[in-house]
């Protein structure tokens, strides 16, 4: 497999579960040959049960279905829930599951964080949505704001090949092409062009971040980044300020109502640096932000699973698509500017932490801990992640008519 820009694709932006889940379930319902689904979280709630029903129906009509769940993100599916799928023929794997220690999950680092669906080499979905009711507006104030894309065209074959190369037993072939192939330069940006990029812990450790940095270097007019967990490294922060100082309008949308308090603490450590450097920072206040999208000028955009924090940039398995398409760029721009106008508060100097020695000391210590601890973990020796396949449930012993007659009469057959 070679990473390259693919032309002639159909690209559709999907916002939140209201748009994403019906599109995915419809595609699964129309699948004829193969379904591959990867996700970090699958809950046994209303949304999870709909996915369960769609996959079960597909398997029962003869479609080959394979599921990869992260062992940390999805630890609590019931045996009955999973066994019903495996009994129907669904190949069900957990990425690097570990036993709990005193009831707590310990396998927090190097997770499989991708969210990908491939249907028959015809349709693919990639983005930030998991399978849980948290992505539906009906969930309430804690419902997540998120994005994905539906793709048709040549890029789907690349995504399918990426998935096939990552199945068990393909490691030798995978290492050969990963060692030699990097994404080539798109020297003639056009329309409906898509590139698959990913992060792993082998030869593609910084591919997604590298595309972001290149985008910031090439930006001429405007960059909008909406990212749920924003805590990048020095190079990224420096590139943001440098772009702002040469006149690029930089809009950064981050969580104002985070699902984890430390997310807000981490982001606010950067406010002085960013705002005083000319970056427009907006806190999204309507509900928790879970999206991972960005755009540049009038043609470049990205959507995927990668946050801009140490876990995504240094440890987790992630996947994004880079898109060159003016129509898609405008659609995403309209959406992001809409939530800025309706649901965001711009961070101004009155909201910045006071520049005291104590605050500066706290910020420096917290920044270095939050930023470097996960990265340091990434350099520690790591075991080879294990893919644990869940086998079909054992079939009950069949009661033959002879056995029944023997029990009823007491006579041996």
Curated annotation (Swiss-Prot):
Membrane as UniProt keyword: yes
Keywords attached to this entry: Cell membrane, Lipid biosynthesis, Lipid metabolism, Membrane, Phospholipid biosynthesis, Phospholipid metabolism, Repeat, Transferase
SMART domains attached to this UniProt entry: PLDc (SM00155)
A Pfam family of this chain: PLDc_2
Predominant location: membrane
Domain (PLD phosphodiesterase): residue spans on this chain: 108-135, 285-312
Cellular component aspect of the GO annotation: plasma membrane
UniProt name for this protein: Cardiolipin synthase B
Gene for this chain: clsB
